[in-house]
Curated annotation (Swiss-Prot):
Auxiliary subunit of GABA-B receptors that determine the pharmacology and kinetics of the receptor response. Increases agonist potency and markedly alter the G-protein signaling of the receptors by accelerating onset and promoting desensitization. Keywords: Cell membrane, Cell projection, Membrane, Phosphoprotein, Postsynaptic cell membrane, Synapse. Pfam families: BTB_2, H1_KCTD8_12_16. Gene3D superfamilies: Potassium Channel Kv1.1, Chain A (3.30.710.10). It is found in: Presynaptic cell membrane; Postsynaptic cell membrane. Homopentamer; forms an open pentamer. In contrast to other BTB domain-containing proteins, does not interact with CUL3. Interacts as a tetramer with GABRB1 and GABRB2. This is BTB/POZ domain-containing protein KCTD16. One of its GO terms (cellular component) is postsynaptic membrane. GO terms for molecular function: G protein-coupled neurotransmitter receptor activity involved in regulation of postsynaptic membrane potential; G protein-coupled neurotransmitter receptor activity involved in regulation of presynaptic membrane potential; identical protein binding. The modification Phosphoserine is found at S130, S137, S143, S146.
Length: 428
């Protein structure tokens, strides 16, 4: 009787001291629903890995492994990423496609299969995020990483890629009843859409950007399929403002529909878009250099760069960056103002320029407040004069307003009971 190629002979333990290999030469694997065929020597090519422990010929573990209905060895992991694990087991190298979005998950799979060399190959980008090579602010350390955005330095960005437009849109709805009702439901925003250049969108929104609809696009390409993971519109505005963007245009369309024919409640739905723009001067290379480099701080502090934009930068002026090619994390910074007298000279620098700009801003605000109070006093006086109208003028105005009212000959659509009552009352 001939045996098939997948069958193996049974050796009783009493006849020999060594246990023969119970695995076939070609092993069939079912990894998360994906079927793989590979050699047994490939699975045990790296000692002390998880696959080496599972398929090692030193111990008879073939009967202990889980199998599917067709007898294939089942591994409950990501079937799509397992192909890169097999590639690494074959020749100790792994080649990923361009703009591969699953790099973090592949690293987690390598850690599960106990492949330390593969983990090292997948961690160069994350090693750059160490505290020694970054310039962190106090806000980022306390925010648990939810609002952290990784902004590339200006030296790595092309000159024509530091500016651009970003469009933020959302479709909102709200339910409003009659005037004076307190149980009206306010704005609901199911999703905030982001359109623009991919590199700009990632720079502003970072990890809060959902890229599942366009995962493999190059950073210099444009997209209109991104959306944010949160639903607070004002939070998106704050993130855009911190990165130097300002709104240049907006539009909105509103439609209303009745809930039913017996009530006056309406559901208002709207689609609104806000267009933000960042000029090249608002994100010049001197912004991060003034905050991160001590050598160029004095020269660039005396230049014509706007100091108000420096307050939105994330790097503290007293921290140092190790190299100009490193990445910088952006976020708000709280700075303490130093009290200095007028009789001693002050060396100009970025911190002093920021203080001067804050003083100018406060003085401008004081002028606007005083001018606004004067205008309000003048307007109140004019209103008082208008209120002192005579009774005859008020009656004449009421008569003119009454003459302007035009009652239609007939009402074609009677949607509400009060319309029919009005017609009966005036015999129309």
């Amino acid at each position: 009787m001939a045996l098939s190629g997948n069958c193996s002979r049974y050796y009783p333990r009493e006849q020999g001291s060594a246990v023969p290999n119970s695995f076939p030469e070609v092993v069939e694997l079912n990894v998360g629903g994906q079927v793989y065929f590979t050699r047994h020597s490939t699975l045990i090519s790296i000692p002390h890995s998880l696959l080496w422990k599972m398929f090692s010929p030193k111990r008879d573990t073939a009967n202990d492994l889980a199998k599917d209905s067709k007898g294939r060895f089942f591994i409950d992991r990501d079937g799509f990423l397992f192909r890169y694990i097999l590639d690494y087991l074959r020749d100790r190298q792994v080649v990923l496609p361009d703009h591969f979005p699953e790099k973090g998950r592949l690293k987690r799979e390598a850690e599960y299969f106990q492949l330390p060399d593969l983990v090292k190959l997948l961690t160069p980008d994350e090693i750059k995020q160490s505290p020694d090579e970054f310039c962190h602010s106090d806000f980022e350390d306390a925010s648990q990483g939810s609002d952290t955005r990784i902004c590339p330095p200006s030296s790595l960005l092309p000159a024509d890629r530091k500016w651009g437009f970003i469009t933020v849109g959302y479709r909102g709805s709200c339910t409003l009843g009659r005037e004076g009702q307190a149980d009206a439901k306010f704005r609901r925003v199911p999703r905030i859409l982001v359109c623009g250049r991919i590199s700009l969108a990632k720079e502003v929104f970072g990890e809060t950007l959902n890229e599942s609809r366009d995962p493999d696009r190059a950073p210099e390409r444009y997209t209109s399929r991104f959306y944010l993971k949160f639903k607070h519109l004002e939070r998106a505005f704050d993130m855009l403002s911190e990165c130097g963007f300002h709104m240049v245009a907006c539009n909105s369309s509103v439609t209303a529909s009745f809930i039913n024919q017996y009530t006056d409640d309406k559901i208002w739905s709207s689609y609104t878009e806000y267009v933000f723009y960042r000029e090249p001067s608002r994100w010049s290379p001197s912004h991060c250099d003034c905050c991160c480099k001590n050598g160029k701080g004095d020269k660039e502090g005396e230049s014509g760069t706007s100091c108000n934009d420096l307050s939105t930068s994330s790097c503290d002026s007293q921290s140092e960056a190790s190299s100009p090619q490193e990445t910088v994390i952006c976020g708000p910074v709280t700075r303490q103002t130093n009290i200095q007298t007028l009789d001693r000279p002050i060396k100009k620098g970025p911190v002093q320029l920021i203080q001067q700009s804050e003083m100018r801003r406060k003085s401008d605000l004081l002028r606007t407040l005083t001018s606004g109070s004067r205008e309000s006093n003048m307007s109140s006086k004019k209103k008082a004069v208008k209120e002192k109208l005579s009774i005859e003028e008020e009656l004449e105005k009421c008569i003119q307003d009454f003459l302007k009212i035009k009652i239609p000959d007939r009402f074609p659509e009677r949607k509400h009971p009060w319309q029919s009552e009005l017609l009966r009352k005036y015999h129309l």
